[in-house]
């Protein structure tokens, strides 16, 4: 221990490095490759009191399996309405994620997720808390949370105008900022914490909203920068149809970026081979050009392979026709590596099964243990084939070593990677 601190003193005295990672530092590091994982309490709808319980030791066992598969990253999904439902259980689970990730050498991005806006608007949906809807007749209960639903369009339009307030008159943006700060305060001092995603796949309904999203992302980024120097991720929008009337283009997507781009990543989803046909290639090229415009690296926060079929005016996921083969996985991940993306996360890891087979990396029956499906094997083999065995695999540290790493980072003189390198070298010296 004395040797470690002697090394630290020498290092600190010879450096004036700040604590932020630049874009070049982000892209020069070994890539992160992993999974999108759903939790238990953090994924509950606000009125959910009947979901099947998670397996015993779900987080711990999952992270061990993920690490054993040669993966080094988890994009961990949570929902704001689950926090409003039970803040204590929510934060307890978030902390358990950070502790287990430290143990197994995984890097976590904590993802503020929404799907179809909120369960207030749609039974299947999860996302925004009910306090933002209650008492406002404009957002009728069950009014629909998808992009084509009028109630959802009203909500998102008001959200970008920053006119949404709860019954007590509290501003929605400020409330989300305070919520995200609770996550940061709970896990930021963990070596496993890579960063935070502001809001997954926000809705865009007209051409005038692109710049407003940029103002929102700038506000949240500025607020979080008061308490963290770790990576902040902002997300692509939905719908992402190239033919939609919202005028999707690299120029407009670039308007979503926060004004402070230090240590920022841009999350996009890829659910087909990027160069599989003209449409998919054009779509992926649009993301690459957006990254070039902003100087912000691409983070493929979701990837898989699906088939969509037309139902009226919209295309919907077809679970029966969707499949992921070894060839598909190699083509997708190969294209992503060639593009030099910052990291990837496969959709998805969850103890609750869904109809699309390839969305299930593990299976679970009550009373049994988590069991890997063939898709975990495909993912493991593909990552090893494309990136090499255990590329970017992170060392594990015990509690004492993690505490030291965190203390070194808090000095403001060492980045997290530098602190880890110092501690690792001291361990090797003995």
Locate the predicted segments by residue.
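Active-site mouth of glycoside hydrolases
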Residues: 27-250
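Intrinsically disordered, low-complexity coil/linker segments enriched for acidic/polar
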Residues: 412-419
């Amino acid at each position: 221990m004395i040797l470690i601190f002697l090394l630290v003193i020498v290092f600190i005295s010879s450096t004036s490095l700040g604590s932020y990672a630049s874009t070049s530092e982000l892209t020069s590091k070994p890539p992160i490759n992993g999974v999108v994982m759903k939790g238990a309490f953090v994924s509950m709808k606000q009125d959910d009191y009947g979901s099947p319980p998670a397996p015993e030791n779900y987080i711990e066992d999952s992270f061990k399996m993920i690490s054993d598969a040669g993966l080094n990253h988890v994009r961990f999904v949570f929902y704001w309405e689950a926090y409003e439902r039970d803040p204590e259980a929510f934060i307890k689970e978030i902390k358990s994620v950070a502790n287990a990730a430290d143990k197994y050498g995984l890097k976590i991005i904590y993802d503020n997720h929404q799907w179809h806006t909120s369960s207030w608007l749609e039974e299947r949906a999860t996302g925004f808390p009910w306090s933002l809807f209650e008492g406002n007749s404009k957002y009728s209960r069950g009014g629909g949370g998808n992009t084509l639903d009028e109630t959802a369009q009203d909500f998102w339009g008001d959200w970008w105008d920053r006119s949404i307030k709860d019954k007590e008159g509290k501003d929605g943006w400020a409330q989300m900022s305070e919520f995200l700060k609770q996550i940061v305060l709970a896990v930021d001092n963990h070596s496993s914490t890579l960063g935070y995603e502001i809001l997954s796949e926000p809705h865009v309904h007209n051409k005038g909203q692109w710049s407003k999203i940029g103002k929102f992302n700038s506000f949240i980024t500025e607020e979080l920068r008061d308490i963290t120097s770790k990576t902040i991720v902002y997300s692509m929008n939905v719908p992402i149809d190239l033919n939609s009337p919202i005028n999707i283009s690299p120029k407009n997507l670039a308007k979503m970026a926060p004004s402070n781009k230090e240590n920022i990543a841009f999350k996009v989803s890829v659910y087909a081979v990027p160069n599989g046909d003209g449409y998919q290639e054009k779509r992926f090229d649009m993301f690459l050009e957006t990254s070039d415009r902003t100087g912000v690296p691409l983070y493929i926060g979701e990837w898989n392979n699906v088939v969509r079929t037309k139902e009226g005016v919209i295309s919907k996921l077809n679970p029966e026709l969707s499949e992921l083969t070894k060839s598909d996985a190699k083509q997708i991940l190969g294209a992503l590596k060639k593009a030099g993306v910052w990291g990837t996360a496969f959709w998805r890891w969850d103890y609750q099964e869904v109809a699309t087979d390839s969305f299930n990396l593990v299976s679970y029956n009550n009373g049994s243990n988590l069991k890997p499906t063939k898709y975990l094997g495909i993912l493991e083999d593909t990552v090893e084939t494309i990136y090499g065995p255990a590329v970017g695999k992170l060392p594990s540290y015990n509690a004492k070593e993690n505490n030291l790493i965190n203390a070194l980072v808090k000095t403001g003189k060492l980045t997290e990677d530098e602190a880890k390198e110092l501690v690792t070298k001291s361990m090797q010296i003995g």
